[in-house]
Amino acid sequence: MAKEVECKVAIDPCLIASLPDVISRTLGDSPLTPVEKYDVYYGRKGKEAEFRIRKDGTTVVVTRKQKEERADGVEVNCEIEFHVSEGDVHAFFTSLGYIPLIEKRKVGSMWRDGNLTVELVHVKGLGDYLEMELLLADDANESELKNALNRLATLRLRFGVADLPLEGRYYNDMLRDIEK
């Protein structure tokens, strides 16, 4: 299990062309990697999504997030993840009474620098987003959390997006809202 500290910002299309260069210069040696993720969120009928199955290239990962409610637009989650083979994963969970509730597709670019992941992605149905995520140990203390929050704020400043509001909602909630 790991604790992730993440923030995301909706990006205006006029910034999309220049942002990859800004991110690459800021992160130095971190290579830009294409990213394409397909997520299916599962839950019980009439209930909230309980977990997701993500296909990222040839990798399939099941993730459950224990979410911490915050008012500052930053997500702090403890994640439980495990890798599976694609074969019967859908059939397995539907046999337990879970159904697919929401689908999400993200396409874009990713940079990694140690425990930091930065993604500039287009989320189908929602638009373009800059995501920044720091992974901490699941037993990270308040000081480590505060340092992570400060680092994310500094990165937003260096990327030139500090004045843009943080999007505190989860993508699956945003997608569910537009389906209503």
Go through each PLM region and give its residues:
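Mixed-charge, glycine-accented linear interaction segment located at domain edges/termini
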Residues: 141-169
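A short, polar/proline- and glycine-enriched secondary-structure boundary/capping micro-motif
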Residues: 72-78, 131, 142-145
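Conserved, surface-exposed functional patches that form binding/active-site neighborhoods
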Residues: 96-142
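N-terminal strand-loop-strand beta-hairpin
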Residues: 1-115, 159-180
